Amino acid sequence: MRVMRPAHLPQARRFCVKAFPDTKGRLGFLDECASGKKQHAGALGLIAAEGQRLVGILCCQVLEDPVLAPGRGPVAHVDLMAVHPAFRRRGVATMMWQRMEAKLVAMGIPSVWTRSRVISAGVDLRKHSEAVVFLLKMGFQKRSDIYDMTSRLDELGLDTSCAEAELRRAGIEVKRIDYSEREALRQFLSTSFPHWAGNADRVTKDGPQLVHIACADGKIIGFAASERRWFGPIGVEPGCRLKGIGKVLLLRGLRDIRARGYKRALIGWANFPFYARSISASITRVMWQMEKRIGGE
């Protein structure tokens, strides 16, 4: 068992891509885990090796999470964990986890969550059932279900003109965001949806065509973003819900996805009732969000 170092990176990247093909091109976090630099102290990586051959890897990130652990200070997220098939059920994963947990406890971290920057927001029950069994054995508990959904765009009526006219009569305007409104969006997210505050730059990086906002009295009260075939995030100020704002923002975003040539929209970490009711979206993946308390809370 070894702490990940820069010399391990080439083999670690190949190992991760083989274990999780979708991570190709998105493995920058490995450099953080291996750097040993103070600014990356919150990125931890362990490898298991047989001689010079890498047979297991475990990476965690330590950060404050206002969604999963509001007001609890830094917690840990499991970014990636994998063991070579030939070395499974030989205690490799258990040893890696026990060493990582000891490190996190020594840092004063109270809990660990199964939320990855590169794989998924939870543990996919269909693809990673073995991982679920392992995590339960290690003391993790299920906290919530997370859904990915999809909707056929060629079967939807996406016109919002009547709904928008009704909102305008109520003093609410829905429009595509302008560059000059990026700071207002950032402030809105920081206040109303702090867990998405970092998305303000991301969702406008390719221009305002990806983002729609709802405004009342000169202030943003809702937003929706899309990227390629993915819809989201979306959010409406709690006091302004149940007025049809969310559905208008949703349909506008789906129109953008259809205009980019996609016949289906994908919705990650979806509010199942809202999307099923609004656009007859169907569930494509169910994940468990799991947590282990390790800090004696």
Regions found by a protein language model. Give the residues of each.
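Short amphipathic alpha-helix that is part of the acyltransferase structural core
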Residues: 1-34, 41, 45-49, 146, ...
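A conserved beta-strand-loop-helix scaffold within acyl/acetyltransferase catalytic domains
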Residues: 17, 21-45, 50, 58-73, ...
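Short, high-confidence coil segments that cap the C-terminus of an alpha-helix
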Residues: 43, 108-109, 262
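A structural microfeature
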Residues: 56, 144-147, 222
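A short, internal acetyl-CoA/4′-phosphopantetheine-binding micro-motif in the GNAT/acyltransferase core
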Residues: 78-88, 118, 231-242, 271
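Conserved acetyl-CoA-binding loop-helix of GNAT-fold acetyltransferases
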Residues: 83, 89-106, 236, 242-255, ...
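Acyl-donor-binding surface of acyltransferase catalytic domains
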Residues: 97-168, 269, 276, 286-295
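Short hairpin/turn module used for nucleic-acid contact or packing/dimerization
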Residues: 242, 255-297
